């Protein structure tokens, strides 16, 4: 009887070890290039994905245009989240994307943002940028950052660009533009709503949402790249974005998602 019980426990222990080993053996690591407006929310999405699948997601954040150039040059990313749809579509046309993997996951928004100690009256909207006290206005570099292009478009549509262009300072991406304001190196910034919606940032400053009529829609796309074709996890991570709880999380961070 004792021998039978001992053998049973050994069998159970062996099965548990095997299950853990097999899961570890199957686990994959994917490398993700992501636009920096996703800096907070994508980390949460990746954590949920890792918990459910046992796979690992390593994310590099930066500007969409820089990642586009790197991927064209052979950078070993498996998934690319862009802050627009043009860069993923261009990669698709170049044959660098897994067929059918493109997904327009959200649309972003831009806001005026200042630190709490700022005396600027944000209720005035973009016209507050005309104040003489505003010496530096941070935006993402419009040459390779979609949020930077949206900021310029908003300034042009409100006839403010010529007035303030000499005071613009550029971050390499939207996260760096945010940091310029957060560290006091700029007085105000035109940045992504998704960054100021992060719990860690909500108490550090104030924001004014810029009318979406003042800039083109910031439609954002993701693709699984051909370099990740041997990793089923790459495509699975893209599909994970379509789940209702992930869509709800994106909306919580200020994104618009055209899904029911």
Regions found by a protein language model. Name each.
Residues 1-7:
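N-terminal secretory signal peptides that target proteins for export/translocation
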Residues 8-10, 26:
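Short linear sequence motif anchored by a di-proline
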Residues 10-21:
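Bacterial N-terminal signal peptides
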Residues 21-27:
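Bacterial Sec-dependent signal peptides at the C-terminal "C-region" and cleavage site
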Residues 27-54, 58-61, 65, 69-75, ...:
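Exported/periplasmic ABC-transporter solute-binding proteins
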